[in-house]
Amino acid sequence: MIGTTSVSRAIGCATISCLLLGLASGASAAPPARALMLQSSYGSTLEARLLASHNRERAAFGAAPLKWDPNLAVAAASYGPSLSAIGRLQHSSRANRPGQAENLWMGTRGAYAPEAMVGAWNDEKRFLRPGVFPYVSSTGNWQDVAHFTQVIWKGTTHVGCAVHRDARYDFLICRYSPKGNIDGRRVP
């Protein structure tokens, strides 16, 4: 699902997890050596800000906080160059992310704070109709809430995200494990 927000143009896309190319987090588990960590212009760690943006919404819906998974973040970061090459949002193949879900976002380079990026997914809650997935959207189209339902999915315990920046765009890729948005399961 691709949608736009009203500020500049931001595009969000649905269910998986995120790898973060940002400031090293100081988390107890060191990221794998192949993870490229860049100094972030976002101030505090990108990891902490993305995690907080997810966990605020989860708390409001009675879901346990997500834990950061550096391996999911590395996997997310590795997909950023592919998005940059095609210049649009397209989910990675499920074969490349077994057992994981993925949320994607795209916006003008440097125009959005991490909270606004995740906020585009969280804004989908306005269409949420609690029920059994996929019958959970007041619009009748589950894709209109799929990013948000993945953010708050109670069975998901870990997330890892990355921001990939090219000359024109920032891409946020988040990967989630275990994946959510499972048909026949209750939301929230």
Residue spans of the language-model regions?
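Bacterial N-terminal signal peptides
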Residues: 12-22
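Short, glycine-/polar-rich solvent-exposed loops and beta-turns at beta-strand/coil boundaries
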Residues: 69, 95-97
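Cytochrome P450 catalytic domain signature, combining two hallmark sequence patches
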Residues: 83-95, 127-133
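A short alpha-helix/helix-coil micro-patch that ends at or immediately precedes a cysteine
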Residues: 34-88
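Bacterial N-terminal signal peptides that target proteins for export
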Residues: 2-14
